[in-house]
């Protein structure tokens, strides 16, 4: 089940210089089998059935509404038979709100020379034990049906920006996009055959070529998926290329369907994505950066292992209400990082995820109040100020 309602759109406004500040931003509500999600939303990534270093209770406390699971990695470990014992991911990982699972396409793509792609699917060696495996659109749908995720992603080929220094040509991007399009249809047929009660999203591909993006979009819209994603961005391309595709594609998707930008990105990317008409985001950046002492704040990024923080009594971000900032100093966080204590990345992950989720809450509030343009100006000024 999926119901999506656009509650409000960004009104056209002008700044003091008379510059147009209107955007494609919209405020929505997404109803899924395991709950209601307010959009725009950031979705923490739980690759192996867990958001790294963060308990489900902590995610609930920071108002996470939906998280991700990774079809490929959960297939590898613990294996489908184990998850099936629990009736799906929700009970297995004790998360009772919505879950989105990706199809495994990106992970198979990232195996590089260890995999072989054909019309039928992808042959590859298991990164766990070396077993020869075969993943097809049909098998991906079967796995995700067993996982019982609220949102199921089609199996696709992630078009790379470059391969060993060779930038993907338009012809190569077209072949990849057309394969993903054919796989989308096979996913749709298998999904319906399985009578999966959840929602299947199509994924727009096409590399950095706007004409291919449009062709992919048109074909997927004709299939009438409940929702759509923009894939194949943040895969090594220059930032300006990613922003160009973001500006081109999301707002052209059906206005009455949810739009998901996959694997993006920085706080600035999220705000830019909202302005481009995106409703849903995911990225490993908050937790991955946290494990490396890189923390996001309202006033720019903070690298906690820097010696300047050795004796600072202030919290990571004095404007933040997360558990970390309410209880611990920069000096303590610096100490944990320097000692390699596991509590360090746990507290840093709590902070970074809270920052991302709160940023989206502020975006929703600005859209509700009809002041998104004003919010964007203040957000940019604050982030550029520096800690």
UniProtKB/Swiss-Prot annotation:
This is Queuine tRNA-ribosyltransferase. It comes from Polaromonas naphthalenivorans (strain CJ2). The lineage of its organism: Bacteria, Pseudomonadati, Pseudomonadota, Betaproteobacteria, Burkholderiales. One of its GO terms (biological process) is tRNA wobble guanine modification. Its cofactor is Zn(2+). The active site is at residues 102, 282. Binds 1 zinc ion per subunit. It is an enzyme of class 2 (transferase). Gene3D superfamilies: Queuine tRNA-ribosyltransferase-like (3.20.20.105). Its EC number is 2.4.2.29.
């Amino acid at each position: 089940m999926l119901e999506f309602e656009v509650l409000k759109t960004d009104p056209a406004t002008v700044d003091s210089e008379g510059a147009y500040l209107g955007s494609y931003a919209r405020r929505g509500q997404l109803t899924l089998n395991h709950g209601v999600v307010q959009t725009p939303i950031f979705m923490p990534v739980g690759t192996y059935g867990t958001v790294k270093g963060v308990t489900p209770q902590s995610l609930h406390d920071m108002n996470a509404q939906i998280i991700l699971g990774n079809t490929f990695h959960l297939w590898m470990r613990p294996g489908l038979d184990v998850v099936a014992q629990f009736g799906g991911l929700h009970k297995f990982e004790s998360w009772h709100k919505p879950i989105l699972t990706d199809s495994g396409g990106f992970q198979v793509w990232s195996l590089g020379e260890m995999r072989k792609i054909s019309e039928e699917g992808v042959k590859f060696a298991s990164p766990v034990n070396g077993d020869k495996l075969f993943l097809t659109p049909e098998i991906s749908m079967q796995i995700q049906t067993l996982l019982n995720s609220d949102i199921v992603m089609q199996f696709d080929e992630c078009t790379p920006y470059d391969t060993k220094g060779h930038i993907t040509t338009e012809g190569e991007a077209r072949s990849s996009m057309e394969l993903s399009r054919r796989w989308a249809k096979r996913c749709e047929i298998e999904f319906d055959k399985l009578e999966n009660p959840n929602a299947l999203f199509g994924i727009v591909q096409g590399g950095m070529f706007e004409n291919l993006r449009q062709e992919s979009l048109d074909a997927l819209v004709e299939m009438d998926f409940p929702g759509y994603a923009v894939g194949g961005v943040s895969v090594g391309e220059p930032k300006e290329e990613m922003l160009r595709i973001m500006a081109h594609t999301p707002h052209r998707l059906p206005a009455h369907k949810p739009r998901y930008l996959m694997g993006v990105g920085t706080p600035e990317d999220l705000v830019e994505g909202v302005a481009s008409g995106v409703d849903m985001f995911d990225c490993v950046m908050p937790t991955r950066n946290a494990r490396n002492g890189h923390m996001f704040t309202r006033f720019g990024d903070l690298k906690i292992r820097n010696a300047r923080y050795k004796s600072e009594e202030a919290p990571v971000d004095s404007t933040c209400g997360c558990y970390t900032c309410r209880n611990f100093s920069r000096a303590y966080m610096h100490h944990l990082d320097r000692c390699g204590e596991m509590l360090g990345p746990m507290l840093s992950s709590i902070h970074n995820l809270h920052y991302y989720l709160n940023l989206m809450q502020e975006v929703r509030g600005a859209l509700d109040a009809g002041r998104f343009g004003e919010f964007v100006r203040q957000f940019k000024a604050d982030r550029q100020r520096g800690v």
